[in-house]
Amino acid sequence: TITELDQRTFLPRPLVGVGAVVWHKDHVLLIQRGKEPHAGTWSLPGGAQELGETVRDAVCREVLEETGVKISSPILVDAVDMISTNDDDKVEYHYTLIDFVAVALNPDITLGGDAADAKWVSVKEVTKYALWNKTIEVIAKSRDVLSSG
C-alpha cells in the first residue's frame, strides 16, 4: 500500500501548507514534528490545506489539531518554499508554506495530530531550537506584522 508520506514525495507540483506563529505574551508556540519530512525537529504548528478549505481556516484547524490552542483572525506574514532534493537532484519535497501570525485565545496545550511535542518558548530562547532559518525569519517578521495589524 502507498503510505501518506509516499503520496507527498516526487510530485509534479508543490503542495500547499500553512503555518502559524502563535503568540502568548512574549512566547511563541513551537511543535516537534512527529512525521517526515524532518521528523523530530522543532517548527511552527501547521500542515496541509484541505480541498475546499481557505488557508486561514486551514491554519486555525492545524494549530488546534496539533496543540489544542485556539486562534482566530490569523494575519498573513509571508509565503516561503521548502524544496528538498535527493542524491540524484530530483525534487523529493516541494511545499509552498503560507505563514500567519495569531494570538492564542487559550494558552493550554493539548497535544494531538502530527506533533510529537509542543511548548511555549520565550522569544529569547527560540534560537536554541535549531529551527529552519526561514522559520526564524518568519517569527521575527510576525512581531512587526502583529504590532502594525
Language model region names:
Residues 24-65:
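Conserved Nudix-box catalytic region and its N-terminal flanking loop in Nudix hydrolases
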Residues 70-79:
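A short coil-to-beta-strand element that immediately follows conserved catalytic motifs
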Residues 80-108:
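Active-site-adjacent beta-strand/loop module that shapes the phosphate/pyrophosphate-binding cleft
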Residues 1-21, 90:
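Acidic, metal-coordinating catalytic segment for phosphate/diphosphate chemistry
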Residues 10-14, 41, 89-96, 115:
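A generic structural micro-feature
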Residues 22-23, 30, 102-104, 120:
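Conserved hydrophobic "DFG−1" position in protein kinase catalytic cores
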Residues 20, 76, 100-102:
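A structural signal for short, well-ordered beta-strand segments
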Residues 99, 110-142:
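NUDIX/MutT-family hydrolases
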